[in-house]
């Protein structure tokens, strides 16, 4: 990796392994504007906002695609460069739907932010672009081509991180668009609803489908009892919108906020995750006893399940039959509230607050609809709940603490870490290992299941059997691992797959954050695990009691599902 010294705006700045000049500039504390640059994606260099001026040659080049060289002298904010950036912004705005006040991304739109930053107050160019139909067919995202600035971020994240290639460029010149192949609607593609395209989109061209109106209607309906479950990853991210550091657990404040908003009962999805851990562990041990099929894949991530259905259905027999924690809670609520609804004449309306856009798709799956109603009536993302709190004028950081309601508000530390990569696999290992000591917990924590590496591999011994485990981030990496398995190059007993970087903490429904922000959220969940009253699912007294009351047959009916192509 290159090392050296360069001059940026007259200041000496060292570099040591940075992959481009842009990284060195940002290291120097200069916030260089970009639309199309993400450090985890390939360099595209299309937006030209990050251009710098070479003091020696006078040339203007994109800093994202320049390698740093020893002795290089550049300027980042000359009069020439500022004019260049303003013209780019004017051209983008000229062909952009500028209904900013009603845009879903207003306040978070990067184009809006940079236009304000660079003082673009008028647009001198005429808009000659056509107007295109909005695509609202996806259960998770909405695509508005009229707000697209052709940065290519969605194209690259879909191809490079997920290996799906759902979106790409079509046509040329002023007719250029980003769209699915053959101008299909999103619902006509093999999109898995991960929503990462919306997470990286700098404008309102792709946004998470907003269902806030449905939530308010339910809350204000006196004939409805609104019950909410909160996923683990939400508690360490929702506070970011209120000045609370990423990773700080604000679950008890969020419970207070939801009660102020008019929600009747608030529960914790970790309760369902403990059910999942026990059921999935029992299934895994049964497979070990019967010799497979292996690998057993985790089933918590609905985008991963959808990917297997679309791309590799032969592996559906390998996926765990356990429902996700969200859907386990949904099934239990459906069972527990049926009699109560009949007695008091109200209808229980079940909302799940999730970090994940694919959960919107999962809730609508026919496997989870009974008697014409879904087990989870509505899924709201962390973003949507933030918007609802802000609409109410609630300042989360100033609220008192209130614990989730019982009996469905109690979860283990193992359940909390479901929200970060490696958490599901670690929870299963904790349950399956016969050694339940604190020392065993410490050893499990350093097995290699944690961290953001694309593919993590480790071994653990249970009884006389050495088990091979893998944890995967991103569907593109999952595809690579499946290829190795197909070709006989790899064998595993258990594989956890999470579609989003870092696991659920990096879900597309979370506040927009850098990679370091996602890491802090994951660290926050591990800290909550460390502080938990009990660390293993089988130590949850309510879950253990309920499973005993239900019995094996009823548990299987409520907690398991099969996926068929």
Q: Which role does the model predict for each range below?
A:
Residues 48-193, 199, 206-218, 224-225:
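Fe-S ferredoxin-like electron-transfer domains
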Residues 10-12, 101, 134, 187, ...:
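A generic secondary-structure micro-motif detector
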Residues 5, 12, 16-73, 77-83, ...:
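Iron-sulfur-associated redox domains of electron-transfer enzymes in respiratory
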Residues 5-8, 97, 130, 139-141, ...:
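A short, structure-level motif marking secondary-structure boundaries and short turns
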């Amino acid at each position: 990796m290159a090392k050296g010294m360069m001059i940026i705006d007259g200041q000496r700045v060292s570099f040591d392994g940075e992959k481009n000049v842009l990284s060195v500039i940002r290291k120097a504390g200069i916030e260089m504007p970009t639309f199309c640059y993400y450090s985890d994606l390939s360099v595209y260099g299309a937006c030209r906002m990050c251009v710098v001026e070479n003091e020696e040659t006078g040339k203007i080049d994109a800093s994202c695609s320049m390698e740093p060289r020893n002795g290089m002298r550049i300027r980042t904010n000359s009069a020439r460069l500022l004019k260049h950036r303003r013209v780019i912004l004017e051209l983008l705005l000229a062909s952009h739907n500028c209904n900013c006040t009603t845009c879903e991304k207003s306040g978070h739109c990067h184009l809006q932010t940079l236009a304000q930053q660079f003082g673009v107050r008028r647009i001198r160019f005429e808009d000659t672009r056509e107007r295109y139909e909005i695509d609202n067919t996806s259960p998770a995202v909405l695509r508005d081509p009229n707000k697209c600035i052709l940065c290519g971020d969605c194209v690259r994240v879909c191809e490079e991180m997920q290996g799906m290639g759902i979106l790409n460029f079509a046509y040329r010149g002023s007719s250029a668009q980003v769209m699915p192949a053959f101008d299909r609607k999103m619902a006509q593609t093999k999109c898995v609803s991960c929503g990462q395209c919306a997470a990286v989109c700098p404008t309102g061209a792709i946004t998470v489908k907003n269902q806030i109106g449905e939530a308010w209607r339910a809350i204000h309906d006196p004939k409805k009892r609104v019950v909410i479950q909160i996923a683990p990853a939400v508690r360490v991210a929702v506070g970011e919108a209120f000045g609370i550091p990423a990773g700080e657990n604000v679950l008890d404040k969020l419970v207070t906020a939801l009660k102020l908003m008019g929600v009747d009962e608030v529960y914790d999805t970790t309760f369902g995750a403990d059910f999942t851990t026990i059921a999935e562990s029992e299934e895994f041990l049964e497979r070990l006893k019967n010799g497979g099929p292996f690998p057993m894949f985790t089933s918590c991530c609905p985008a991963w399940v959808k990917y297997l259905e679309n791309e590799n259905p032969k592996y559906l027999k390998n996926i765990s039959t356990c429902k996700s924690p969200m859907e386990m809670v949904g099934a239990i609520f459906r069972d527990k509230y049926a009699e109560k609804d009949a007695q008091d004449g109200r209808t229980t309306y079940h909302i799940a607050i999730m970090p994940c856009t694919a959960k919107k798709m999962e809730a609508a799956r026919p496997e989870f609809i009974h008697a014409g109603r879904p087990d989870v009536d509505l899924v709201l993302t962390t973003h949507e709940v933030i918007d609802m709190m802000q609409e109410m004028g609630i300042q989360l950081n100033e609220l008192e603490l209130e614990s989730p309601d019982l009996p469905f508000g109690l979860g283990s530390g193992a359940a909390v870490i479901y929200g970060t990569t490696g958490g599901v696999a670690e929870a299963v290992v904790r349950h399956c290992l016969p050694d339940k000591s604190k020392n065993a917990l410490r050893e499990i924590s350093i097995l290699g299941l944690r961290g953001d590496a694309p593919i993590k591999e480790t071994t653990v011994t249970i009884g006389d059997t050495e088990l091979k485990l893998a944890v995967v981030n991103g569907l593109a990496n999952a595809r690579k691992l499946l290829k190795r398995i197909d070709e006989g190059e790899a064998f595993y007993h258990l594989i956890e797959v999470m579609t989003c970087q870092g696991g659920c903490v990096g879900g597309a429904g979370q506040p927009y954050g850098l990679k370091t922000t996602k890491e802090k959220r994951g660290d926050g969940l591990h800290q909550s695990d460390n502080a938990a009253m009990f660390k293993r699912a089988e130590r949850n007294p309510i879950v253990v009691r309920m499973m005993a009351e239900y019995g094996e047959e009823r548990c299987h009916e409520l907690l398991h599902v099969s996926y068929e192509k």
